Amino acid sequence: METPLEKALTTMVTTFHKYSGREGSKLTLSRKELKELIKTELSLAEKMKESSIDNLMKSLDKNSDQEIDFKEYSVFLTTLCMAYNDFFLEDNK
């Protein structure tokens, strides 16, 4: 039986692969795929402007290949986890 943390990790990996490869490489997310992932999987997307998604793509795409690989996606998730933790800490003061 999977632990809650293992389920979370499985979800993060399967979510990446659910969107990657719809166009281009199965191992990367294009801008369009990243945008679709964000808009579908994250409630914060409702508040994001197109320019914010473009800026996010640029900041994540460390090798400047116009695609987000799994390592770059992992950095995105880590950043989100840190933001959620900050929110949690602030909310519990």
Swiss-Prot record:
One Pfam entry name: S_100
Binding site for Ca(2+) 2: 61, 63, 65, 67, 72
Keyword annotations of the record: Calcium, Copper, Metal-binding, Repeat, Zinc
CDD domains to which the protein is assigned, alphabetical: S-100
Residues binding Ca(2+) 1, per UniProt: 28, 33
GO molecular function (one): calcium-dependent protein binding
PROSITE patterns, sorted: EF_HAND_1 (PS00018), EF_HAND_2 (PS50222), S100_CABP (PS00303)
Gene Ontology cellular-component annotations: neuronal cell body; nucleus
Domain EF-hand: 12-47, 48-83
Keyword presence, DNA damage: no
PANTHER family, alphabetized: PROTEIN S100-A5, S100 CALCIUM-BINDING PROTEIN
Subunit and partners: Homodimer.
Protein role: Binds calcium, zinc and copper. One subunit can simultaneously bind 2 calcium ions or 2 copper ions plus 1 zinc ion. Calcium and copper ions compete for the same binding sites.
Protein name: Protein S100-A5
Organism: Rattus norvegicus
